[in-house]
Swiss-Prot record:
This is Orotidine 5'-phosphate decarboxylase. Its EC number is 4.1.1.23. GO terms for biological process: 'de novo' pyrimidine nucleobase biosynthetic process; 'de novo' UMP biosynthetic process. It comes from Vibrio parahaemolyticus serotype O3:K6 (strain RIMD 2210633). Catalyzes the decarboxylation of orotidine 5'-monophosphate (OMP) to uridine 5'-monophosphate (UMP). Homodimer. It comes from the Bacteria. The lineage of its organism: Bacteria, Pseudomonadati, Pseudomonadota, Gammaproteobacteria, Vibrionales.
């Protein structure tokens, strides 16, 4: 099977609406991301419903806690059968290492474990507000390096950082990029954005795209257009 590059970010407060959307798209064309709001509203059974429909799921809960608690949450995600799960890299090396080690018994069936560096909504002024007097890019590199040194599979990062991180951390280290908007789309609340083709060419491995697909009149056609544009490069 072709490794789908597109991860569709589901953003619904009604489960029936979410499943109605999901039933309009093909699991061969994308993966799905379930975040904090939907998981809190609908729980693990919603993820199981997506699995029944053939979709791989990125469980985007950004765990950040003491090592024991965080690693057990990661293990629970593995038990649920998700394809990818993430933790905040700012939780530190011990937390990330514990989370990686708890997945080792799952072997090839374990989910990808990804670190979150700097949220794409954050600018330098936001970092300064929490006591970090650094450029976002500098903090991203610092946390991404810590993530790799902790043995994780990759990081979430903006497309602007992808090229630098690929060069710094190697081709095998996966880069998952939100803030992706197909040409002509509304910027939304993401500050650091890029088109799908630009992001892949910059070094991103997977692209998180939400409203341009979920709010489209024909989401399957939008997905096909994005995938075709990526296949032609």
């Amino acid at each position: 099977m072709i490794d789908q590059k597109v991860i569709v970010a589901l953003d619904y407060d009604n489960q029936a609406d979410a499943l109605a959307f999901v039933d309009r798209i093909d699991p061969a064309s994308c993966r799905l991301k379930v975040g904090k709001e939907m998981f809190t509203l609908f729980g693990p059974d919603f993820v199981r419903e997506l699995h029944k429909r053939g979709f791989s799921v990125f469980l985007d809960l950004k765990f950040h806690d003491i090592p024991n608690t965080c690693s057990k949450a990661v293990r629970a995600a593995a038990e649920l059968g998700v394809w990818m799960v993430n933790v905040h890299a700012s939780g530190g090396e011990r937390m990330m290492t514990a989370s990686r080690e708890i997945l080792e018994p799952y072997g090839k069936d374990r989910p990808l474990l990804i670190g979150v560096t700097v949220l794409t909504s954050m600018e330098q002024s936001d970092l300064a507000g929490i006591g970090l007097n650094v450029e976002p890019q500098e903090q991203v590199i610092r946390l991404a390096t810590l993530t790799k040194n902790s043995g994780l599979d990759g990081v979430v990062c903006s497309a602007q950082e992808s090229s630098l991180l690929k060069n710094e951390l190697g081709k095998e280290f996966k880069l998952i990029t939100p803030g992706i908007r197909p040409a002509g789309s509304d910027q939304g609340d993401q500050r650091r954005i890029m088109t799908p083709v630009d992001a892949i060419q910059a070094g991103s491995d997977y692209l998180v795209i939400g409203r341009p697909i979920t709010q489209a009149t024909d989401p399957a056609a939008v997905l096909k257009s994005i995938n075709d544009s990526l296949a032609s490069k």
